[in-house]
A protein has these predicted regions:
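N-proximal low-complexity "stem/linker" segments adjacent to membrane-targeting elements
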Residues: 1-29, 241-293
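C-terminal, non-catalytic tails of nucleotide-sugar-dependent glycosyltransferases
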Residues: 1-2, 220-263, 395, 407-433, ...
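Short, acidic, metal-binding catalytic loop of nucleotide-sugar glycosyltransferases
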Residues: 27-37, 289-303
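A conserved acidic beta->alpha catalytic loop
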Residues: 44-53, 71, 309-319, 365
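Glycine-rich, basic loop-to-helix element that forms the pyrophosphate-binding segment
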Residues: 69-86, 335-352
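A recurrent flexible, glycine/aromatic-enriched loop bordering the glycosyltransferase active site
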Residues: 76, 84, 137-166, 179, ...
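Short aromatic/hydrophobic "clamp" motif used to bind/position activated sugar donors
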Residues: 91, 357
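Conserved donor NDP-sugar-binding/catalytic core segment of glycosyltransferases
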Residues: 103-138, 365-408
Length: 554
């Protein structure tokens, strides 16, 4: 007797009193999958609406197995029952009112088979959009490739998710007490052990907007966010990050406050000519105010020294003023060559005595107290190569939210209001990015030395791009944080034109990397920094429900 091989995918759906038409559409979307290697495990968590039972009664098929609980136990209990009944290689999570794209499972299978080692693929996720009450799709969410820091700050993955069944079992399945955040909790635990994590950059799920859904009103589920906060705190404890976790200023966002190890010394390296300018109605020596704003913020866990690489031609008043402001914490490195930003930074770091170096432009002023400790907290993680800060123009708009390399080299969300959370909470969360500006960037001194510092082939422009990409090539993550913030009066102190020779160097060394940003998305418009989708990517209704309940697909 031949025993049938188990299916590749077990789609798990827990049901509790959805709109019957929405449930019918959900089930139908599974039935019309172009991939045939699946089963659908449905657990009804004691729905009270008899119409829901009628839909389930009529939904039976060879691939669908409907189980009914005797009493309502909540989504974790129902999900645990569904997992126990599943036999597939991967489990796929599908909410009872959401709709799969017809090729969803086929695309997941292709992603597994196309990996360098298919047997090592443990977690997959896709892009999604929202399914409006009028049946049209809207607001696609085009996600980055794997971004662990962002997942700690909020569940950017959400839907659609497939996880290797054996790994789900290894981490203990769905944990009781995390109802409402059970998926986020599972993703965090799975990610700690996953060998390969694959992002499929296609909209393969339509997330229903309904009265009870977080997709419609994130403020409806405070208990879910509290469960998510505990999930993040538990995750950080498991991976050895000493931190507290709070619910953030925006729904679904968590604020992580990391404790520093010991009392680190941070060398603030500032190259300057001693330039002056007028900002907010006052003439200033930029480097004086840059240093004074940090001195005024003293009292954190980090000790500061100020390594100022000062042009020998600068007015003597500049150095005298720095001495009064910084006192014994000041180290002056005289510089008598033609302007070369990379050389100045390298000279400053060579003279630095700190465990960490903060690369800082002179035309900055601290905006958020505690910024340096925030950056050190991230940089003390062994796999973090560099930490970038939020930079604001003097009018309060965003100058820097991380780099974007999508055919151009740009600042993410350039010009957005500085207090806006940004699309998909981008401006409100710590997250990986391909690079950050050296106008305010912190890294461990040994890491700077490991990758050879800044390139002398890039004296004026793109030196921070090159540094970022060298760090990533060495296996480090680059993290941007909104919790460290400076004013940046860019162009007030110095504005150097782009040198074609420097463009040629970046093209020679990083041709592929500046065109393929893993933290952007191929569905987004190239050459932009605002996460605008390419034309024609969303909006069509995926199906229509007729008066008799029949689902007709578009």
């Amino acid at each position: 007797m031949t025993v049938a091989a188990p299916p590749r995918f077990s789609v798990l759906t827990t049901v509790y009193d959805p709109d019957p038409d929405h449930l019918r559409a959900c089930l139908a979307s599974a039935d019309r999958q172009t991939c045939g290697d699946w089963e659908h495990v449905v657990v009804d968590d004691a729905s009270t609406d008899s119409a829901v039972g009628d839909v389930l009664d009529r939904s039976g098929s060879e691939r669908r197995h409907v189980h009914r609980r005797g009493s309502n136990g909540g989504i974790v209990a129902a999900s645990t029952d569904a997992l126990a009944a599943a036999v597939g290689e991967f489990v796929v999570l599908l909410d009872h009112d959401d709709v799969l794209a017809p090729a969803a499972l086929e695309r997941l299978a292709d992603a597994v088979d196309g990996a360098d080692d298919p047997s090592a693929v443990d977690l997959l996720y896709t892009d999604h959009d929202l399914l409006r009450p009028d049946g049209r799709t809207a607001w696609p969410v085009y996600k980055p490739d794997w971004s662990p820091e962002r997942l700690r700050n909020h569940n950017y993955i959400t839907h659609l998710v497939a996880v290797r069944r054996s790994l789900v079992d290894d981490v203990g399945g769905f944990r009781p007490g995390f109802d409402g955040a059970q998926d986020h909790d599972l993703l965090l635990r799975v990610s700690e052990r996953a060998r390969t994590i694959v992002h499929v950059p296609e909209v393969l799920l339509h997330w229903r907007q309904s009265a009870a859904s977080v997709a419609t009103d994130t403020g409806r589920k405070p208990q879910a966010y509290e469960a998510g906060r505990r999930a993040v705190a538990d995750h950080l404890a498991r991976i050895g990050v000493d931190a507290t976790v709070e619910t953030g200023a925006h729904d679904g966002v968590y604020r992580i406050r990391r404790r520093l190890t010991g009392t680190p010394t941070v060398s603030v390296v500032i190259p300057t000519r001693g330039s002056t300018g007028r900002v907010w109605g006052r003439t200033r020596i930029f480097v004086h105010d840059a240093v004074a704003s940090l001195v005024a913020d003293a009292g954190g866990a980090s000790r500061l020294e100020f390594v100022v690489v000062l042009d020998s031609s600068a007015d003597p008043v500049v150095e005298r003023g720095l001495g009064r402001i910084a006192g014994d914490a000041l180290v002056v490195v005289p510089y008598d060559k033609a302007f070369d930003f990379s050389d100045k930074i390298n000279a400053g770091v060579a003279a630095a005595g700190g465990d960490y170096v903060l690369l800082l432009n002179d035309d900055t002023e601290l905006h958020a107290p505690g910024s340096i400790d925030e950056m050190v907290g991230l940089a003390q993680q062994a796999d973090v190569g560099m930490v970038g800060a939020e930079l604001l123009y003097e009018d309060g708009t965003l100058q820097h939210g991380g780099h974007v390399y999508n055919g151009t080299i740009s600042h993410a969300l350039l010009g957005w209001p500085g207090d806006h959370p940004g699309p998909h909470r981008l401006q409100a969360v710590e997250r990986e990015c391909s690079g950050v500006t050296a106008a305010a960037a912190l890294l461990r001194r040994d890491v700077f030395d490991e990758v050879g510092g800044m390139s002398r082939e890039l004296p004026h422009n793109y030196n921070d791009v090159d540094l970022s990409l060298k760090l990533r090539r060495a296996g480090y993550r680059i993290v941007w944080t909104p919790h460290a913030c400076w004013w940046h009066f860019e162009g007030r102190s110095f504005d150097h034109p782009i040198d074609p020779a420097e463009v040629a160097v970046i093209e020679r060394d990083w041709h592929h990397e500046i065109r393929h940003d893993p933290y952007y998305n191929s569905n987004l418009a190239p050459g932009r920094t605002d996460w605008l989708e390419r034309p024609g990517r969303s909006g069509a209704p995926p199906y229509e429900t007729l008066a008799d309940g029949t689902v007709v697909w578009g």
